[in-house]
Protein backbone atom coordinates (compact mmCIF):
# COMPACT_ATOMS: atom_id res chain seq x y z
CA UNK A 1 0.00 0.00 0.00
CA UNK A 2 1.35 3.43 -0.94
CA UNK A 3 2.14 5.79 1.95
CA UNK A 4 -0.41 8.57 2.40
CA UNK A 5 1.24 10.64 5.14
CA UNK A 6 4.96 11.52 5.13
CA UNK A 7 7.05 13.23 7.79
CA UNK A 8 10.47 14.72 6.96
CA UNK A 9 12.77 15.58 9.85
CA UNK A 10 16.13 17.28 10.01
CA UNK A 11 15.54 19.34 6.87
CA UNK A 12 18.29 21.94 6.49
CA UNK A 13 17.50 23.99 3.39
CA UNK A 14 14.32 21.96 2.66
CA UNK A 15 15.69 20.92 -0.74
CA UNK A 16 14.86 17.26 -0.13
CA UNK A 17 11.22 18.08 0.62
CA UNK A 18 10.98 20.37 -2.41
CA UNK A 19 12.41 17.69 -4.69
CA UNK A 20 10.42 14.83 -3.20
CA UNK A 21 6.99 16.39 -3.70
CA UNK A 22 7.49 16.61 -7.47
CA UNK A 23 7.19 12.85 -7.75
CA UNK A 24 4.32 12.37 -5.32
CA UNK A 25 0.63 11.99 -5.94
CA UNK A 26 -1.22 15.18 -4.95
CA UNK A 27 -3.26 13.19 -2.42
CA UNK A 28 -0.15 12.42 -0.35
CA UNK A 29 0.15 14.60 2.74
CA UNK A 30 3.67 15.87 3.55
CA UNK A 31 4.92 17.51 6.74
CA UNK A 32 8.46 18.91 6.48
CA UNK A 33 10.30 19.90 9.66
CA UNK A 34 13.67 21.43 10.46
CA UNK A 35 15.64 21.91 13.66
CA UNK A 36 16.43 25.55 12.91
CA UNK A 37 13.98 28.37 13.45
CA UNK A 38 12.58 30.35 10.54
CA UNK A 39 14.77 33.40 11.21
CA UNK A 40 17.97 31.37 10.75
CA UNK A 41 17.08 30.72 7.10
CA UNK A 42 16.57 34.36 6.07
CA UNK A 43 20.05 34.64 4.59
CA UNK A 44 19.79 31.41 2.56
CA UNK A 45 18.19 32.07 -0.85
CA UNK A 46 18.08 28.34 -1.68
CA UNK A 47 16.12 27.60 1.48
CA UNK A 48 13.73 30.50 0.88
CA UNK A 49 13.03 29.33 -2.67
CA UNK A 50 12.36 25.80 -1.45
CA UNK A 51 10.00 27.06 1.25
CA UNK A 52 8.11 29.02 -1.36
CA UNK A 53 7.66 25.88 -3.49
CA UNK A 54 6.46 23.93 -0.48
CA UNK A 55 3.87 26.57 0.42
CA UNK A 56 2.57 26.58 -3.16
CA UNK A 57 2.07 22.81 -2.97
CA UNK A 58 0.28 23.03 0.37
CA UNK A 59 3.03 21.27 2.32
CA UNK A 60 2.96 21.85 6.07
CA UNK A 61 6.30 23.23 7.27
CA UNK A 62 7.34 23.30 10.93
CA UNK A 63 10.47 24.97 12.34
CA UNK A 64 12.34 24.35 15.56
CA UNK A 65 11.37 20.66 15.64
CA UNK A 66 13.64 18.40 17.68
CA UNK A 67 13.62 14.98 16.01
CA UNK A 68 14.25 13.34 19.39
CA UNK A 69 10.99 14.77 20.78
CA UNK A 70 8.53 14.44 17.92
CA UNK A 71 5.55 13.83 20.19
CA UNK A 72 6.11 17.28 21.73
CA UNK A 73 6.21 19.00 18.34
CA UNK A 74 3.25 17.24 16.75
CA UNK A 75 -0.28 17.33 18.19
CA UNK A 76 -1.93 14.03 19.03
CA UNK A 77 -4.36 14.30 16.12
CA UNK A 78 -1.53 14.91 13.62
CA UNK A 79 0.49 11.71 13.95
CA UNK A 80 0.28 8.16 12.58
CA UNK A 81 2.66 8.88 9.70
CA UNK A 82 3.16 6.15 7.12
CA UNK A 83 6.79 7.10 6.53
CA UNK A 84 9.42 9.20 8.29
CA UNK A 85 12.56 10.42 6.48
CA UNK A 86 15.81 11.46 8.13
CA UNK A 87 18.71 12.11 5.74
CA UNK A 88 22.33 12.27 6.92
CA UNK A 89 21.67 12.82 10.63
CA UNK A 90 24.50 14.46 12.52
CA UNK A 91 24.92 16.08 15.91
CA UNK A 92 26.94 18.89 14.38
CA UNK A 93 30.53 20.04 14.33
CA UNK A 94 33.03 17.30 15.23
CA UNK A 95 30.69 15.08 17.22
CA UNK A 96 32.03 11.53 17.57
CA UNK A 97 30.30 8.23 16.94
CA UNK A 98 29.01 8.00 20.52
CA UNK A 99 27.11 11.29 20.25
CA UNK A 100 25.65 10.34 16.89
CA UNK A 101 24.58 6.94 18.19
CA UNK A 102 22.77 8.73 21.00
CA UNK A 103 21.06 10.97 18.44
CA UNK A 104 19.87 7.94 16.47
CA UNK A 105 18.67 6.11 19.57
CA UNK A 106 16.58 9.05 20.77
CA UNK A 107 15.27 9.65 17.25
CA UNK A 108 14.02 6.07 16.91
CA UNK A 109 12.42 6.17 20.34
CA UNK A 110 10.68 9.38 19.32
CA UNK A 111 9.50 7.85 16.02
CA UNK A 112 7.63 5.14 17.89
CA UNK A 113 5.25 7.81 19.23
CA UNK A 114 4.20 9.23 15.85
CA UNK A 115 4.52 6.36 13.34
CA UNK A 116 1.58 4.29 12.11
CA UNK A 117 1.61 0.62 13.05
CA UNK A 118 2.70 -0.52 9.58
CA UNK A 119 4.82 2.57 8.92
CA UNK A 120 8.46 2.83 7.88
CA UNK A 121 11.42 4.93 9.00
CA UNK A 122 13.94 5.80 6.26
CA UNK A 123 17.37 6.84 7.52
CA UNK A 124 20.14 7.69 5.05
CA UNK A 125 23.75 7.49 6.25
CA UNK A 126 27.11 8.08 4.64
CA UNK A 127 29.20 5.13 3.53
CA UNK A 128 30.26 2.95 6.44
CA UNK A 129 28.37 4.80 9.16
CA UNK A 130 25.65 2.16 9.58
CA UNK A 131 28.05 -0.61 10.57
CA UNK A 132 26.14 -3.31 8.66
CA UNK A 133 27.37 -5.82 6.06
CA UNK A 134 25.51 -3.74 3.46
CA UNK A 135 28.28 -1.13 3.75
CA UNK A 136 31.15 -1.61 1.33
CA UNK A 137 33.58 -1.60 3.00
CA UNK A 138 32.10 -2.40 6.38
CA UNK A 139 33.45 -0.47 9.34
CA UNK A 140 34.37 -2.10 12.61
CA UNK A 141 31.31 -2.31 14.85
CA UNK A 142 32.81 -0.14 17.59
CA UNK A 143 33.68 2.57 15.05
CA UNK A 144 30.23 2.74 13.44
CA UNK A 145 26.94 4.33 14.38
CA UNK A 146 25.46 0.86 15.02
CA UNK A 147 22.23 1.93 13.37
CA UNK A 148 20.41 -1.41 13.79
CA UNK A 149 21.18 -1.58 17.51
CA UNK A 150 20.12 2.04 18.00
CA UNK A 151 16.87 1.37 16.15
CA UNK A 152 16.16 -1.58 18.44
CA UNK A 153 16.00 0.83 21.37
CA UNK A 154 12.88 2.27 19.75
CA UNK A 155 11.43 -1.14 18.92
CA UNK A 156 12.48 -1.14 15.24
CA UNK A 157 14.06 -3.78 13.02
CA UNK A 158 15.93 -3.23 9.76
CA UNK A 159 13.73 -4.51 6.93
CA UNK A 160 15.53 -3.27 3.81
CA UNK A 161 18.61 -1.41 2.59
CA UNK A 162 19.03 0.37 -0.73
CA UNK A 163 21.59 2.78 -2.24
CA UNK A 164 20.72 6.44 -1.85
CA UNK A 165 20.02 7.91 -5.28
CA UNK A 166 20.35 11.65 -5.90
CA UNK A 167 18.75 11.12 -9.30
CA UNK A 168 15.49 10.22 -7.58
CA UNK A 169 15.36 13.66 -5.93
CA UNK A 170 16.88 16.12 -8.45
CA UNK A 171 17.61 19.44 -6.84
CA UNK A 172 18.40 17.94 -3.44
CA UNK A 173 21.45 19.55 -1.84
CA UNK A 174 22.43 18.05 1.48
CA UNK A 175 24.12 20.55 3.79
CA UNK A 176 25.17 20.71 7.40
CA UNK A 177 28.48 18.85 7.35
CA UNK A 178 30.12 19.85 10.64
CA UNK A 179 27.39 22.50 11.05
CA UNK A 180 28.58 24.31 7.94
CA UNK A 181 27.06 25.03 4.55
CA UNK A 182 29.01 22.11 3.14
CA UNK A 183 27.57 18.90 1.64
CA UNK A 184 28.11 15.43 3.04
CA UNK A 185 30.03 12.85 1.03
CA UNK A 186 27.10 10.92 -0.39
CA UNK A 187 28.98 8.51 -2.64
CA UNK A 188 28.16 5.02 -1.36
CA UNK A 189 25.45 6.36 0.96
CA UNK A 190 22.74 3.90 1.98
CA UNK A 191 19.11 4.31 2.96
CA UNK A 192 18.10 2.01 5.81
CA UNK A 193 14.40 1.17 6.01
CA UNK A 194 13.09 0.23 9.45
CA UNK A 195 9.75 -1.19 10.54
CA UNK A 196 8.25 -1.76 13.94
CA UNK A 197 8.97 -5.03 15.68
CA UNK A 198 6.57 -7.16 17.64
CA UNK A 199 7.20 -6.52 21.34
CA UNK A 200 8.73 -9.10 23.61
CA UNK A 201 5.85 -10.63 25.52
CA UNK A 202 5.97 -11.30 29.23
CA UNK A 203 7.53 -14.59 30.20
CA UNK A 204 4.20 -15.92 31.47
CA UNK A 205 3.71 -19.27 29.67
CA UNK A 206 0.39 -20.13 28.05
CA UNK A 207 -2.04 -22.47 29.79
CA UNK A 208 -3.78 -25.44 28.16
CA UNK A 209 -6.71 -27.59 29.25
CA UNK A 210 -7.07 -31.32 28.67
CA UNK A 211 -9.86 -33.73 29.44
CA UNK A 212 -8.99 -37.15 30.83
CA UNK A 213 -11.93 -39.49 31.28
CA UNK A 214 -14.64 -37.27 32.76
CA UNK A 215 -12.36 -34.71 34.39
CA UNK A 216 -10.62 -31.52 33.27
CA UNK A 217 -6.99 -30.68 33.95
CA UNK A 218 -4.69 -27.86 32.95
CA UNK A 219 -0.97 -27.57 32.36
CA UNK A 220 1.41 -24.77 31.47
CA UNK A 221 3.49 -24.64 28.33
CA UNK A 222 7.13 -25.58 28.99
CA UNK A 223 9.15 -22.38 29.26
CA UNK A 224 11.66 -23.71 26.74
CA UNK A 225 8.88 -24.00 24.13
CA UNK A 226 7.42 -20.48 24.02
CA UNK A 227 4.68 -20.24 21.41
CA UNK A 228 5.29 -23.75 20.08
CA UNK A 229 2.18 -25.66 21.18
CA UNK A 230 -1.10 -25.81 19.28
CA UNK A 231 0.05 -23.65 16.32
CA UNK A 232 -1.80 -25.77 13.70
CA UNK A 233 0.56 -25.06 10.81
CA UNK A 234 -0.46 -28.28 9.03
CA UNK A 235 -4.21 -27.75 9.04
CA UNK A 236 -6.11 -27.28 5.78
CA UNK A 237 -6.76 -23.60 6.52
CA UNK A 238 -3.04 -22.87 6.97
CA UNK A 239 -0.93 -21.16 4.31
CA UNK A 240 2.30 -21.75 6.22
CA UNK A 241 5.25 -22.96 4.09
CA UNK A 242 5.50 -26.05 6.30
CA UNK A 243 2.09 -27.15 5.06
CA UNK A 244 3.00 -26.23 1.48
CA UNK A 245 6.16 -28.34 1.49
CA UNK A 246 4.37 -31.23 3.19
CA UNK A 247 1.53 -31.27 0.67
CA UNK A 248 3.95 -31.15 -2.26
CA UNK A 249 6.06 -34.00 -0.87
CA UNK A 250 3.01 -36.17 -0.24
CA UNK A 251 1.61 -35.39 -3.70
CA UNK A 252 4.90 -36.38 -5.37
CA UNK A 253 4.97 -39.77 -3.66
CA UNK A 254 1.25 -40.17 -4.29
CA UNK A 255 1.97 -40.30 -8.02
CA UNK A 256 3.55 -43.72 -7.49
CA UNK A 257 1.98 -45.20 -4.37
CA UNK A 258 -1.64 -45.38 -3.19
CA UNK A 259 -1.94 -42.94 -0.29
CA UNK A 260 -3.78 -43.24 2.98
CA UNK A 261 -3.58 -40.11 5.10
CA UNK A 262 -4.07 -40.66 8.81
CA UNK A 263 -5.28 -38.23 11.42
CA UNK A 264 -2.32 -37.45 13.62
CA UNK A 265 -2.84 -38.16 17.33
CA UNK A 266 -2.34 -35.29 19.73
CA UNK A 267 1.24 -34.81 20.91
CA UNK A 268 0.54 -35.79 24.53
CA UNK A 269 1.80 -39.12 25.82
CA UNK A 270 1.55 -40.63 29.28
CA UNK A 271 4.12 -42.84 30.93
CA UNK A 272 1.64 -45.67 30.55
CA UNK A 273 0.89 -44.84 26.93
CA UNK A 274 2.98 -45.28 23.78
CA UNK A 275 6.68 -45.62 24.39
CA UNK A 276 8.94 -42.63 23.98
CA UNK A 277 11.69 -45.00 22.88
CA UNK A 278 12.65 -44.79 19.24
CA UNK A 279 12.22 -48.35 17.95
CA UNK A 280 15.35 -48.11 15.78
CA UNK A 281 17.82 -47.35 18.52
CA UNK A 282 15.94 -47.85 21.77
CA UNK A 283 17.50 -44.62 22.97
CA UNK A 284 15.31 -42.63 25.30
CA UNK A 285 14.80 -39.27 23.64
CA UNK A 286 15.10 -36.16 25.81
CA UNK A 287 11.42 -35.52 26.44
CA UNK A 288 9.60 -32.49 27.75
CA UNK A 289 7.47 -33.72 30.66
CA UNK A 290 4.51 -31.77 32.01
CA UNK A 291 2.45 -32.12 35.16
CA UNK A 292 -1.30 -31.86 35.25
CA UNK A 293 -3.26 -29.79 37.73
CA UNK A 294 -6.94 -30.43 38.28
CA UNK A 295 -9.19 -27.70 36.92
CA UNK A 296 -11.88 -26.91 39.47
CA UNK A 297 -13.70 -24.47 37.20
CA UNK A 298 -15.43 -27.17 35.16
CA UNK A 299 -18.87 -25.63 35.52
CA UNK A 300 -17.65 -22.34 34.08
CA UNK A 301 -16.12 -24.05 31.08
CA UNK A 302 -19.20 -26.17 30.51
CA UNK A 303 -21.14 -22.92 30.21
CA UNK A 304 -18.78 -21.79 27.47
CA UNK A 305 -16.92 -19.24 29.59
CA UNK A 306 -13.39 -20.18 28.53
CA UNK A 307 -10.78 -17.62 29.52
CA UNK A 308 -8.64 -16.29 26.69
CA UNK A 309 -5.36 -17.39 28.22
CA UNK A 310 -6.61 -20.99 28.25
CA UNK A 311 -6.38 -23.10 25.11
CA UNK A 312 -8.23 -26.38 24.96
CA UNK A 313 -6.61 -29.67 23.90
CA UNK A 314 -9.01 -32.63 24.08
CA UNK A 315 -7.27 -35.91 24.90
CA UNK A 316 -9.03 -39.23 24.46
CA UNK A 317 -9.15 -41.81 27.21
CA UNK A 318 -7.24 -44.30 25.07
CA UNK A 319 -4.23 -41.98 24.87
CA UNK A 320 -3.94 -41.06 28.54
CA UNK A 321 -5.74 -42.60 31.49
CA UNK A 322 -6.03 -41.61 35.10
CA UNK A 323 -4.85 -43.94 37.85
CA UNK A 324 -7.56 -45.56 39.90
CA UNK A 325 -8.57 -43.49 42.90
CA UNK A 326 -10.61 -44.80 45.84
CA UNK A 327 -11.85 -41.28 46.52
CA UNK A 328 -13.83 -39.34 43.89
CA UNK A 329 -15.62 -36.86 46.14
CA UNK A 330 -13.37 -33.89 45.45
CA UNK A 331 -11.06 -34.43 48.39
CA UNK A 332 -8.08 -32.15 47.96
CA UNK A 333 -5.61 -34.77 49.12
CA UNK A 334 -6.94 -37.33 46.67
CA UNK A 335 -6.86 -34.83 43.83
CA UNK A 336 -3.25 -33.89 44.54
CA UNK A 337 -2.33 -37.56 44.69
CA UNK A 338 -3.82 -38.24 41.30
CA UNK A 339 -2.23 -35.18 39.74
CA UNK A 340 1.12 -36.18 41.14
CA UNK A 341 0.87 -39.52 39.35
CA UNK A 342 -0.40 -38.15 36.03
CA UNK A 343 2.65 -37.05 34.10
CA UNK A 344 2.37 -36.34 30.40
CA UNK A 345 5.17 -36.04 27.89
CA UNK A 346 5.24 -34.14 24.64
CA UNK A 347 5.77 -36.56 21.77
CA UNK A 348 9.47 -36.58 20.68
CA UNK A 349 8.82 -38.41 17.40
CA UNK A 350 5.94 -39.72 15.29
CA UNK A 351 7.64 -43.11 15.42
CA UNK A 352 5.98 -43.64 18.79
CA UNK A 353 2.74 -44.23 16.87
CA UNK A 354 3.92 -46.94 14.45
CA UNK A 355 2.65 -49.87 16.52
CA UNK A 356 -0.84 -48.41 16.66
CA UNK A 357 -0.86 -47.69 12.92
CA UNK A 358 0.27 -51.06 11.59
CA UNK A 359 -1.91 -53.03 14.00
CA UNK A 360 -4.97 -51.03 13.08
CA UNK A 361 -7.66 -53.19 11.39
CA UNK A 362 -7.82 -50.80 8.42
CA UNK A 363 -4.07 -50.88 7.70
CA UNK A 364 -3.58 -51.54 3.97
CA UNK A 365 -0.42 -53.30 2.76
CA UNK A 366 1.22 -51.75 -0.34
CA UNK A 367 -0.37 -48.37 0.49
CA UNK A 368 1.70 -45.47 1.74
CA UNK A 369 0.28 -44.40 5.10
CA UNK A 370 1.05 -40.79 5.99
CA UNK A 371 1.16 -39.23 9.43
CA UNK A 372 2.11 -35.55 9.93
CA UNK A 373 2.36 -33.52 13.12
CA UNK A 374 4.53 -31.53 15.54
CA UNK A 375 7.14 -33.20 17.74
CA UNK A 376 9.15 -31.87 20.67
CA UNK A 377 12.46 -32.85 22.20
CA UNK A 378 15.15 -31.26 24.31
CA UNK A 379 18.30 -30.45 22.37
CA UNK A 380 21.45 -28.37 22.45
CA UNK A 381 21.39 -24.85 21.04
CA UNK A 382 22.83 -25.20 17.54
CA UNK A 383 21.91 -23.56 14.20
CA UNK A 384 20.03 -26.56 12.79
CA UNK A 385 18.84 -28.20 16.00
CA UNK A 386 15.32 -27.34 17.08
CA UNK A 387 13.30 -28.25 20.19
CA UNK A 388 10.06 -28.26 18.19
CA UNK A 389 9.50 -29.17 14.56
CA UNK A 390 7.00 -30.80 12.24
CA UNK A 391 7.54 -34.35 11.13
CA UNK A 392 5.98 -36.40 8.35
CA UNK A 393 6.09 -40.17 8.70
CA UNK A 394 5.54 -42.47 5.71
CA UNK A 395 4.70 -46.09 6.54
CA UNK A 396 4.78 -48.75 3.84
CA UNK A 397 3.97 -52.40 4.50
CA UNK A 398 4.48 -55.19 1.99
CA UNK A 399 4.85 -58.97 1.83
CA UNK A 400 8.28 -60.37 2.56
CA UNK A 401 8.73 -61.56 -1.02
CA UNK A 402 8.10 -58.01 -2.34
CA UNK A 403 10.93 -56.31 -0.45
CA UNK A 404 13.43 -56.43 -3.31
CA UNK A 405 11.10 -54.44 -5.57
CA UNK A 406 9.15 -52.20 -3.18
CA UNK A 407 12.06 -50.78 -1.19
CA UNK A 408 14.18 -49.58 -4.16
CA UNK A 409 11.07 -48.07 -5.74
CA UNK A 410 10.22 -46.09 -2.61
CA UNK A 411 13.80 -44.90 -2.11
CA UNK A 412 14.16 -43.83 -5.73
CA UNK A 413 10.94 -41.85 -5.83
CA UNK A 414 11.64 -40.32 -2.41
CA UNK A 415 15.04 -39.11 -3.56
CA UNK A 416 13.56 -37.61 -6.73
CA UNK A 417 10.76 -35.90 -4.79
CA UNK A 418 13.16 -34.35 -2.29
CA UNK A 419 15.53 -33.27 -5.04
CA UNK A 420 12.73 -31.56 -6.96
CA UNK A 421 11.54 -29.66 -3.90
CA UNK A 422 15.04 -28.48 -3.02
CA UNK A 423 15.88 -27.13 -6.47
CA UNK A 424 12.74 -25.12 -7.24
CA UNK A 425 14.19 -21.83 -5.98
CA UNK A 426 17.55 -22.14 -7.76
CA UNK A 427 18.12 -19.58 -10.48
CA UNK A 428 19.14 -20.83 -13.89
CA UNK A 429 22.90 -21.15 -14.11
CA UNK A 430 23.35 -20.91 -10.35
CA UNK A 431 26.50 -22.53 -9.03
CA UNK A 432 24.84 -23.13 -5.67
CA UNK A 433 22.92 -26.31 -5.23
CA UNK A 434 21.56 -29.02 -2.98
CA UNK A 435 22.25 -32.74 -3.07
CA UNK A 436 20.28 -35.53 -1.38
CA UNK A 437 22.05 -38.66 -0.23
CA UNK A 438 20.85 -41.77 1.61
CA UNK A 439 23.65 -42.89 3.92
CA UNK A 440 23.55 -46.55 4.90
CA UNK A 441 23.91 -47.15 8.63
CA UNK A 442 26.22 -49.69 10.32
CA UNK A 443 23.40 -52.24 10.64
CA UNK A 444 23.32 -52.45 6.83
CA UNK A 445 19.56 -51.89 6.69
CA UNK A 446 18.64 -48.38 7.77
CA UNK A 447 19.50 -45.03 6.19
CA UNK A 448 20.01 -41.44 7.26
CA UNK A 449 18.86 -38.78 4.78
CA UNK A 450 21.68 -36.27 4.28
CA UNK A 451 21.31 -33.01 2.42
CA UNK A 452 24.36 -30.97 1.53
CA UNK A 453 23.41 -27.39 0.74
CA UNK A 454 25.59 -24.44 -0.23
CA UNK A 455 22.66 -22.03 -0.17
CA UNK A 456 23.49 -20.87 3.36
CA UNK A 457 27.10 -20.08 2.52
CA UNK A 458 30.36 -21.98 3.06
CA UNK A 459 29.94 -21.98 6.84
CA UNK A 460 26.78 -24.07 6.53
CA UNK A 461 27.91 -26.45 3.80
CA UNK A 462 27.71 -29.39 6.18
CA UNK A 463 25.57 -32.47 5.71
CA UNK A 464 22.23 -31.75 7.33
CA UNK A 465 20.24 -34.73 8.53
CA UNK A 466 16.65 -34.12 7.47
CA UNK A 467 15.27 -37.57 8.16
CA UNK A 468 15.73 -41.31 8.39
CA UNK A 469 14.63 -44.49 6.64
CA UNK A 470 14.10 -47.50 8.88
CA UNK A 471 13.88 -50.90 7.20
CA UNK A 472 15.06 -53.18 10.00
CA UNK A 473 12.48 -55.25 11.80
CA UNK A 474 11.61 -52.73 14.47
CA UNK A 475 8.08 -54.15 14.47
CA UNK A 476 7.53 -57.89 14.62
CA UNK A 477 5.13 -59.32 12.05
CA UNK A 478 4.91 -62.80 10.59
CA UNK A 479 4.29 -62.12 6.92
CA UNK A 480 5.06 -58.46 6.33
CA UNK A 481 8.01 -56.07 6.16
CA UNK A 482 7.72 -52.37 6.92
CA UNK A 483 9.57 -49.24 5.88
CA UNK A 484 9.31 -46.08 7.96
CA UNK A 485 10.43 -42.79 6.42
CA UNK A 486 10.68 -39.85 8.83
CA UNK A 487 11.17 -36.32 7.41
CA UNK A 488 11.91 -33.14 9.37
CA UNK A 489 9.63 -30.71 7.52
CA UNK A 490 11.08 -27.61 9.17
CA UNK A 491 14.58 -28.37 7.89
CA UNK A 492 13.14 -29.21 4.49
CA UNK A 493 11.40 -25.82 4.38
CA UNK A 494 14.59 -24.03 5.38
CA UNK A 495 16.50 -25.69 2.56
CA UNK A 496 13.77 -25.25 -0.05
CA UNK A 497 13.00 -21.60 0.72
CA UNK A 498 16.51 -20.48 1.73
CA UNK A 499 15.53 -19.72 5.34
CA UNK A 500 18.65 -19.62 7.50
CA UNK A 501 17.04 -19.42 10.96
CA UNK A 502 14.49 -22.04 12.04
CA UNK A 503 13.01 -19.73 14.68
CA UNK A 504 11.38 -17.52 12.03
CA UNK A 505 9.08 -20.43 11.16
CA UNK A 506 7.39 -19.99 14.56
CA UNK A 507 7.04 -16.21 14.52
CA UNK A 508 3.72 -14.56 15.33
CA UNK A 509 4.57 -11.70 12.96
CA UNK A 510 2.09 -11.63 10.08
CA UNK A 511 4.79 -10.27 7.76
CA UNK A 512 6.32 -13.74 7.61
CA UNK A 513 3.35 -15.41 5.93
CA UNK A 514 2.86 -12.44 3.61
CA UNK A 515 6.24 -13.28 2.08
CA UNK A 516 4.82 -16.47 0.54
CA UNK A 517 2.44 -17.08 -2.34
CA UNK A 518 0.01 -19.91 -1.50
CA UNK A 519 1.23 -23.24 -2.81
CA UNK A 520 4.47 -21.87 -4.27
CA UNK A 521 8.09 -22.40 -3.29
CA UNK A 522 9.98 -19.12 -3.61
CA UNK A 523 13.16 -17.80 -2.07
CA UNK A 524 12.43 -16.17 1.28
CA UNK A 525 13.40 -12.55 1.81
CA UNK A 526 13.68 -11.71 5.49
CA UNK A 527 12.04 -8.61 6.94
CA UNK A 528 14.66 -8.41 9.71
CA UNK A 529 18.19 -7.83 8.41
CA UNK A 530 21.52 -7.85 10.24
CA UNK A 531 20.14 -8.17 13.80
CA UNK A 532 22.79 -7.24 16.36
CA UNK A 533 24.17 -9.87 18.72
CA UNK A 534 25.25 -9.52 22.33
CA UNK A 535 27.79 -11.78 24.04
CA UNK A 536 27.83 -12.66 27.75
CA UNK A 537 29.98 -15.10 29.70
CA UNK A 538 28.94 -17.08 32.75
CA UNK A 539 31.21 -18.96 35.15
CA UNK A 540 30.09 -21.18 38.01
CA UNK A 541 31.20 -23.87 40.44
CA UNK A 542 29.57 -27.26 39.85
CA UNK A 543 28.17 -29.48 42.57
CA UNK A 544 30.66 -32.26 43.21
CA UNK A 545 27.90 -34.63 44.26
CA UNK A 546 25.87 -34.20 41.07
CA UNK A 547 26.93 -34.56 37.46
CA UNK A 548 26.57 -31.35 35.49
CA UNK A 549 23.78 -31.71 32.92
CA UNK A 550 24.78 -29.66 29.88
CA UNK A 551 21.53 -30.43 28.05
CA UNK A 552 19.52 -28.92 30.91
CA UNK A 553 21.93 -25.97 30.89
CA UNK A 554 21.01 -25.32 27.26
CA UNK A 555 17.31 -25.86 28.02
CA UNK A 556 17.36 -23.27 30.81
CA UNK A 557 19.12 -20.81 28.48
CA UNK A 558 16.44 -21.37 25.86
CA UNK A 559 13.66 -20.85 28.40
CA UNK A 560 14.99 -17.73 30.07
CA UNK A 561 15.96 -16.02 26.81
CA UNK A 562 12.68 -16.78 24.98
CA UNK A 563 14.75 -18.51 22.29
CA UNK A 564 17.06 -15.54 21.73
CA UNK A 565 20.24 -17.44 22.65
CA UNK A 566 21.71 -18.66 19.35
CA UNK A 567 25.00 -20.03 20.62
CA UNK A 568 26.32 -21.63 23.81
CA UNK A 569 30.06 -22.21 23.71
CA UNK A 570 32.11 -24.07 26.28
CA UNK A 571 35.08 -21.83 27.07
CA UNK A 572 37.09 -23.15 29.98
CA UNK A 573 37.37 -25.54 32.91
CA UNK A 574 39.18 -24.61 36.09
CA UNK A 575 39.96 -26.70 39.15
CA UNK A 576 40.88 -24.93 42.34
CA UNK A 577 44.35 -26.11 43.42
CA UNK A 578 43.40 -26.33 47.10
CA UNK A 579 39.70 -27.21 47.29
CA UNK A 580 39.76 -29.22 44.03
CA UNK A 581 36.39 -27.69 43.23
CA UNK A 582 35.62 -27.48 39.50
CA UNK A 583 34.44 -24.36 37.71
CA UNK A 584 33.07 -24.15 34.16
CA UNK A 585 32.83 -21.15 31.86
CA UNK A 586 30.41 -20.76 28.94
CA UNK A 587 29.79 -17.98 26.45
CA UNK A 588 26.23 -17.15 25.39
CA UNK A 589 25.34 -15.17 22.27
CA UNK A 590 21.95 -13.45 22.13
CA UNK A 591 20.37 -12.58 18.79
CA UNK A 592 16.82 -12.48 17.44
CA UNK A 593 15.48 -13.15 13.97
CA UNK A 594 12.21 -11.21 14.08
CA UNK A 595 12.22 -8.81 17.03
CA UNK A 596 14.15 -5.79 18.28
CA UNK A 597 16.54 -7.03 20.96
CA UNK A 598 18.25 -4.32 22.98
CA UNK A 599 21.51 -4.72 24.91
CA UNK A 600 19.62 -3.89 28.10
CA UNK A 601 17.14 -6.72 27.57
CA UNK A 602 19.91 -9.18 26.71
CA UNK A 603 21.74 -8.20 29.90
CA UNK A 604 18.56 -8.66 31.93
CA UNK A 605 18.06 -12.12 30.42
CA UNK A 606 21.64 -13.04 31.27
CA UNK A 607 21.12 -11.91 34.86
CA UNK A 608 17.99 -14.04 35.13
CA UNK A 609 19.84 -16.97 33.56
CA UNK A 610 22.47 -16.83 36.29
CA UNK A 611 19.73 -17.07 38.92
CA UNK A 612 17.94 -19.92 37.17
CA UNK A 613 20.97 -22.18 36.74
CA UNK A 614 21.72 -21.66 40.41
CA UNK A 615 18.17 -22.67 41.31
CA UNK A 616 17.62 -25.50 38.83
CA UNK A 617 21.09 -26.95 38.28
CA UNK A 618 22.46 -26.37 41.79
CA UNK A 619 25.58 -24.54 40.67
CA UNK A 620 27.24 -21.59 42.39
CA UNK A 621 28.02 -18.52 40.24
CA UNK A 622 31.55 -17.21 40.47
Curated annotation (Swiss-Prot):
GO BP term, example: rRNA base methylation
CDD domains the record matches: AdoMet_MTases (cd02440)
GO molecular function, one term: rRNA (uridine-N3-)-methyltransferase activity
Record-given protein name: Ferredoxin-fold anticodon-binding domain-containing protein 1 homolog
SMART domains for this protein: FDX-ACB
Source organism: Mus musculus
Species lineage: Eukaryota, Metazoa, Chordata, Craniata, Vertebrata
Domain (FDX-ACB): residue spans on this chain: 529-622
Source organism superkingdom: Eukaryota
PROSITE patterns for the chain: FDX_ACB
A Pfam family annotated for this UniProt entry: FDX-ACB
Cross-referenced PANTHER family: FERREDOXIN-FOLD ANTICODON-BINDING DOMAIN-CONTAINING PROTEIN 1 (PTHR11538:SF26), PHENYLALANYL-TRNA SYNTHETASE (PTHR11538)
